[in-house]
Design a protein with these regions (language model features):
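A short, compositionally biased
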Residues: 1-3, 69-70, 94-95
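C-terminal boundary/linker segments immediately following FHA domains
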Residues: 57, 76-114
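Short polybasic amphipathic segments
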Residues: 2-6, 73-75, 99
Length: 114
């Protein structure tokens, strides 16, 4: 267990393997990997895409990847300006980072012990 992902919607997901996030997430497992967990974000305004982003688990590291979302995935890191992620370009994650899905929801990376 590398940590937890806490959504502003109240959902909490243990980061044991990949997590795909969106209004109607769907995913095919990467070769040699278990099926990703699907985290549904309820968004009446539809600012989040159906398949918005993924949190990738690679050995002992975490990364976030925008999956071609319409309104963008943003990385909010303490002490730095918010940054929009380039689509399909994984970005390393650390405990304390916040992922913003357009204006629909935020996902906070927490330590597994919290």
């Amino acid at each position: 267990l590398l940590g937890r992902l806490r959504a502003s919607t109240g959902a909490v997901v243990d980061l044991r393997h990949d997590v795909v996030v969106g209004r109607a997430p769907a995913a095919t497992p990467r070769p040699g990997r278990p099926s990703p967990e699907l985290l549904i974000i309820t968004d009446a305004d539809k600012s989040a895409s159906k398949v918005h982003c993924a949190v990738r688990v690679e050995d002992w590291d975490l990364a976030v990847e925008d999956l071609g979302s319409s309104n963008g995935t943003f990385l909010l890191r303490p002490g730095r300006a918010p940054r929009r992620l380039a689509p399909h370009s994984p970005e390393p994650l650390a405990v304390g980072d916040v992922i913003s899905l357009a204006d629909a929801a935020t996902l906070t990376v927490e330590d597994a012990d919290e």
